[in-house]
Regions:
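Long, compositionally biased
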Residues: 30-70
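N-terminal interaction modules that seed assembly of large macromolecular complexes
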Residues: 1-45
Length: 132
């Protein structure tokens, strides 16, 4: 949600927050989920000095993509990819940072190429192979 609101890629937000802040946010997620989502985004913007960008996830060819996945849809996709590719001795936050800093995100976030719609195991295999 934060990335979409800011018109930034997920990589930007993850890197601006860093490991310690992401760890904290995951720990308090059950509380934050009961807060107003827009207020949470604004609080993150203020606290971490997040800036607006120029990446518009909805800027796709409508002939190739009739429905943009929701933030929740994408969160599920990335959560599965993180868990499916966790490395030995790597925690979830380290995996999250690793995935969001990988080129596969640009492929998955391009809803016109079909990668988003592939089953989880195909995305995990593509990540491990370094390409779709």
């Amino acid at each position: 949600k934060t990335s979409r609101f800011l018109h930034q890629r997920n990589q930007y937000v993850v890197n601006q927050l860093g490991y310690d802040h992401l760890y904290h946010l995951i720990r308090v997620a059950n509380v934050l989920h009961s807060d107003n989502p827009d207020q949470v985004v604004h609080d993150l913007m203020d606290e971490y000095k997040l800036e607006y960008g120029s990446f518009y996830v909805e800027n796709v060819n409508s002939e190739l993509c009739s429905r943009i996945p929701t933030e929740l849809d994408m969160g599920k996709v990335y959560a599965r990819l993180i868990v499916d590719t966790l490395l030995p001795n790597e925690d979830y936050i380290q995996g999250l940072i690793r995935i969001y800093n990988d080129a596969i995100c640009q492929v998955i976030d391009d809803y016109t190429n079909g990668a988003y719609y592939e089953p989880s195991y195909v995305k995990a295999r593509a990540y491990k192979n370094g390409e779709f």
